[in-house]
Structures are given as structure tokens and as C-alpha cells.
Amino acid sequence: MKPRHRRLTLIALVLGGLGLSAGLALTAFQDNLVFFFTPSEVMAREAPIDRPIRIGGLVKAGSVEREAASARVHFKVTDTAESITVSYDGILPDLFREGQGVVAQGRLGADGRFHATQVLARHDETYMPAEAKEALDRIGQGNGTPGPDGHPETTTAY
């Protein structure tokens, strides 16, 4: 084999390996990517069905229902404009309460319910995930305090 042919073969193998590695990395990244949606966006059918997503908002007052024979809980998450029913089979966080902020991760079913695999409650009265805060500010339900630029101030997520 001539040196030039050997060099071209080596370059082709290296480029092929890099391409394969990039393809595998992008596939893994896409499989682990989870987008955030508000109840209004879910009800407007902007969220994918049967793909992992996160929804966030407030637990609607009077909506929490617990099944007696299991750990399954049903509740509604609202952004004050729309609500979506969430089903969760597990133990809820200690800070989970009606009227408090919550982020649920799971899948939107064809039945219109959100089937959560994880429920996160905010950990003090000033904390709200940045995505949820921005979404509430967009629909005019944020804290309403204008900042120096005239837009509502947002609470920083730590």
C-alpha cells in the first residue's frame, strides 16, 4: 500500500468514527431532552403526546383527589388561564399543597391527562422554576412588580 493511499484510508476512518460518535451523541441527547410546557400550551395542543415533558404551574385549590386503595393521586395544575389533570402514582413531596407551585415530569396521554413520573414542589414561598415564572409573566400572572426595564421582575431559580 502506498503512503498516500494509507493516509487517505486513515483520514476516512477517523472522519467516519467522528461522524458515528456525533450521531450517537445527538441520538442520546434527543432521547434525554425534556421540554417545559404550561397548562395553556398543553391545552393548545403545543405539547407532544406520549413523549417526556414537564408541566408547571399552581396546584388548583380543591382539585387533589387520592385513591383509597393505592398511592395514586389526581390533581389539576393551572396557570390561572387553563388547567390540566395530572395523575401520579407515588408519594408526593412534603411541600405539595393546593395553591402552591409544582413541576411535574411525565407524559401527556391520548386521554388528555398528564401521567406524571415525578412531582417537584417549590421549596419556599419565593421560589419558582424560571420556566414557570416566565410563562406566568407572559400571561400576566407573575408578581406584577415592574423591574427597571418596565417588565415584571422575575424570581431567580437557585
Curated annotation (Swiss-Prot):
Location(s) in or outside the cell: Cell inner membrane
Domain of life: Bacteria
Keyword list, A-Z: Cell inner membrane, Cell membrane, Cytochrome c-type biogenesis, Heme, Iron, Membrane, Metal-binding, Signal-anchor, Transmembrane, Transmembrane helix
Membrane spanning residue stretches: 8-28
Periplasmic side, ranges: 29-158
Topological domains, Cytoplasmic: 1-7
Protein's recorded name: Cytochrome c-type biogenesis protein CcmE
